[in-house]
Amino acid sequence: MGIFNFLKRKNEAEAAPVQEIPVQDAPVQETEAPVAEEEQPALTSLSAFTEEALPSASGLYPHEILMLHLAPAFHPENNSFQKFWLDVYGVCSPQTILDRLLEQGYIEVSGMEEAISHLTVTKLRELLQQFGLSPAGKKAEMVRRLLDMEDQSQLEALCPERYFVRTEKGEKELKENWYVPYLHSHRNAIPLTIWAASRQIHQEKKDFSQILLETLKAGAGAHLNSHDYAQYRNACLANYAALQDAGMDQEAFHCLCETAYYDLSGLGDGETLLQDESPASLRSFLTAKEKLLSGHFMLVVPAVKQSLRQEQEQRELSDEDFRVLLLEEFDGVELPFQLFSNEECADLLLAVIHDDTETPARLLDSAKARLQEELSAL
């Protein structure tokens, strides 16, 4: 959308008079509400969760795939399990899941190498010194030094703990169902459960990447519906990180560009004046944006600047090519108002990346001049 396009609609319309309705004061009776005892939320049972879900092609349910992902942190017995197993997933006996995965050949008990690899660097140094070996080097070098010892009997006695490792079958299952560990690690940020995702994947035959993108777009879009553009911008930045973690680099880059685009638009939360096209409302809106530019207007936050710089470096693009790429991403985004044209936005972002202060100063002056011209025309 062009700069100030919204001004072309009914900019000479007058606001309808507002009728004031008298309100009669009613007596207020003060009552003290009873204080309810704090109740712990009821936990959902595992059976209720699995009724919502569908198993993988191999027959594993999402909570079993999650255990497959976390299995290398556990021993064959005497484990302590995290609280989320019961609170989030309704699993009362995580050890039973480990035992079943072992029986089915998804995991196996590790050998000495995995046992030593779980030791801290401090403990490794102590062992090396105990056997008269050099404690220098990186952790992997210290582990290899211990494993190269001819007599492993003493080492076996000092490191009796064993861990699980995934078999080839287990690695294949986890690779095919990567959505489970992904959603587990993002469970506080993405409103999609492993149970619901499993049903969409296996019943609706949808790719998880598509499901994830639809979920993130819906969550961010709710802010646009309420004209909270700053919150939408924050959601886009969060989605950039979430999509990067999912390996969806192109979709992530679009979210980063959209974040910067909204940063440069000058739009904030609760921009309801954009819905009222009366001259008075338009004047108030433009005056507020003029004050915004006259103050300390931050173009983009440091995190966005750093991410844009990294994106350009990783793509090994010249400034000219990166500018073209930015314009392509801006082209699909519609804004109700812009302080800068798309070309100016691209120039500003390149200036920010390279710590150029002259270009932003010039373009800020141009934007202020445009605002003043529009205000004079009202």
PLM features: residue spans?
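Basic helix-extension-helix modules of the SAP/HeH family
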Residues: F4-F6, P34-R187, A367-L378
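Short, flexible helical or helix-coil boundary motifs
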Residues: N11-E14, G105, K123, F131, ...
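Extended amphipathic alpha-helical coiled-coil/heptad-repeat regions
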Residues: R187-S366, R370
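N-terminal intrinsically disordered, low-complexity tails
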Residues: R9-E37
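Residue-level detector of solvent-exposed, low-hydrophobicity positions
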Residues: K10-E14, L68, G170-E171, S185, ...
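Flexible coil/linker segments and helix-coil junctions enriched in charged and small residues
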Residues: K8, V143-L146, D276-R283
